[in-house]
């Protein structure tokens, strides 16, 4: 009996921050910043920064590379990122709250690669700046409109913003583009918005968008969605406004009709991950 109680307490501790509260599944992967610590990657993609470059990125934003203790303090309040990055003194690692088979080797804590002798290795960065102003955010309201930084004025160069939408379990997300004007190029390699039908920007890729044509509406397959906005160091444009509305689960009486209603009315849409209502 004592052993069973002990095992229960261990499991309870492990699940804190990863369960349901007020009908919303809380998963700390959504936290882009905690205790002044935040994750940065190069604008060219993941694992592109040398130690000197990572240090310069943090200092450019008014901060510095996070120490191991600062990263661990952030992890203890829910900071979870599945990407190795430079820390102070040439250390590399990443914070894991929830163990998983594809991230963290099934462990929790700081996955520590130690102090690297080769400072030319390329990783991401973990910066510390408790006073930095970040674009993006986490939304749990049933409907919301969010905008590019400075909208309706043009956005600035060198922006990286994340918006995470997490609704009540069972709901889905109807995403609509109200205004959209980004630098246009054939491969959307300069300025773009990426949409993911998941809780992070690793899984569930839906599409990358640029130019000035309004993308079609998108409906998620679940109650979470992630949007990433990136601008490069040159041309800017008018920016965007994006609206989302929660879609309640289809009632049993309407099953089989392949219909659903939101306050946005009937419009063409792309279902997240190409599923259908």
UniProtKB/Swiss-Prot annotation:
Effect of changing residue 94 to F: reported as:
Abolishes binding to bikunin. Has no effect on transesterification reaction
Residue ranges of domain Link in the record? 36-129
Describe what happens upon changing residue 39 to K.
Decreases binding of hyaluronan to CD44. Decreases hyaluronan-dependent lymphocyte rolling
Give the consequence of mutating residue 105 to V. Answer: Impairs binding of hyaluronan to CD44. Decreases hyaluronan-dependent lymphocyte rolling
Q: Name one Pfam family in it.
A: CUB
State which residues carry a glycan (glycosylated): 118, 258
**Disulfide partners:** 58-127, 82-103, 135-161, 188-210
| Cell inner membrane keyword on record | no
**InterPro entries listed in its UniProt record:** C-type_lectin-like/link_sf, CTDL_fold, CUB_dom, Link_dom, Sperma_CUB_dom_sf, Spermadhesin-Link_domain
User: What happens when you mutate residue 47 to F?
Assistant: Abolishes binding to bikunin. Impairs binding to hyaluronan. Retains the ability to bind heavy chains but cannot transfer them onto hyaluronan. Impairs binding of hyaluronan to CD44. Decreases hyaluronan-dependent lymphocyte rolling
Entry keyword set: Calcium, Cell adhesion, Disulfide bond, Glycoprotein, Hydrolase, Metal-binding, Secreted, Signal
Which tissues is it found in, per the record?
Answer: Expressed in airway epithelium and submucosal gland (at protein level). Colocalizes with bikunin at the ciliary border. Present in bronchoalveolar lavage fluid (at protein level). Expressed in mesenchymal stem cells. Found in the synovial fluid of patients with rheumatoid arthritis.
Q: How does activity depend on pH?
A: Optimally active at pH 6.5-8.
EC number(s): the record gives 3.1.1.-
Its annotated compartments are:
Secreted
Residues that bind Ca(2+), according to the entry?
Answer: 183, 191, 232, 234-235
Induction notes from the record: Up-regulated in peripheral blood mononuclear cells, high endothelial venules, airway epithelium and submucosal gland in response to inflammatory cytokine TNF. Down-regulated upon differentiation of mesenchymal stem cells to osteoblasts.
> What does UniProt give as the signal peptide span?
1-17
Q: Describe how it is modified after translation.
A: N-glycosylated.
Q: Name one GO cellular component term.
A: tertiary granule lumen
Biological role stated in the UniProt entry: Major regulator of extracellular matrix organization during tissue remodeling. Catalyzes the transfer of a heavy chain (HC) from inter-alpha-inhibitor (I-alpha-I) complex to hyaluronan. Cleaves the ester bond between the C-terminus of the HC and GalNAc residue of the chondroitin sulfate chain in I-alpha-I complex followed by transesterification of the HC to hyaluronan. In the process, potentiates the antiprotease function of I-alpha-I complex through release of free bikunin.
Describe, as the record does, how this protein assembles with itself and its partners. Interacts (via Link domain) with inter-alpha-inhibitor (I-alpha-I) component bikunin. Interacts with ITIH2/HC2; this interaction is required for transesterification of the HC to hyaluronan. Interacts (via Link and CUB domains) with ITIH1. Chondroitin sulfate may be required for the stability of the complex. Interacts (via Link domain) with various C-X-C and C-C chemokines including PF4, CXCL8, CXCL11, CXCL12, CCL2, CCL7, CCL19, CCL21, and CCL27; this interaction interferes with chemokine binding to glycosaminoglycans.
Domain remarks? The Link domain interacts with various extracellular matrix components, including heparin, heparan sulfates, hyaluronan and I-alpha-I complex. It is required for binding to various chemokines. The CUB domain is necessary for calcium ion binding and transesterification reaction. It is required for binding to FN1.
Task: Write the protein's name.
Answer: Tumor necrosis factor-inducible gene 6 protein
Query: What organism is the protein native to?
Result: Homo sapiens (Human)
Q: What is the lineage of its organism?
A: Eukaryota, Metazoa, Chordata, Craniata, Vertebrata
């Amino acid at each position: 009996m004592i052993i069973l109680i002990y095992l229960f307490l261990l499991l309870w501790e492990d699940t804190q921050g990863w369960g349901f509260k007020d009908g919303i599944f809380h998963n700390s992967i959504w936290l882009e910043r905690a205790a002044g610590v935040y994750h940065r990657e190069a604008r060219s993609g993941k694992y592109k920064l040398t130690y000197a470059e990572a240090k310069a990125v943090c200092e450019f934003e008014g901060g510095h590379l996070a120490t191991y203790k600062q990263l661990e303090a952030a992890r203890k309040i829910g900071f979870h990122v599945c990407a190795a990055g430079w820390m102070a003194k040439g250390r590399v690692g990443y914070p894991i709250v929830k163990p998983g088979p594809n991230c963290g080797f099934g462990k929790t804590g700081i996955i520590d690669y130690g102090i690297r002798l080769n400072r030319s290795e390329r990783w991401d960065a973990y910066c510390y700046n408790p006073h930095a102003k970040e674009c993006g955010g986490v939304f749990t309201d049933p409907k919301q409109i969010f905008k590019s930084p400075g909208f309706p004025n043009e956005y600035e160069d060198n922006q990286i913003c994340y918006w995470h939408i997490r609704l009540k379990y069972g709901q889905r997300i109807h995403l609509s583009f109200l205004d959209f004007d980004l630098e246009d190029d054939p491969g959307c390699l300069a300025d773009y918005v990426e949409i993911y039908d998941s809780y992070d920007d690793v899984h569930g890729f839906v599409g990358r968008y640029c130019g000035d044509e309004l993308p079609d509406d998108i409906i998620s397959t679940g109650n979470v969605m992630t949007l990433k906005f990136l601008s490069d160091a040159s041309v800017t444009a008018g920016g965007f406004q994006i609206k989302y509305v929660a879609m309640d689960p289809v009632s049993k009486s309407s099953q089989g009709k392949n219909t659903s209603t939101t306050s946005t009315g009937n419009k063409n849409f792309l279902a997240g991950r190409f599923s259908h209502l």
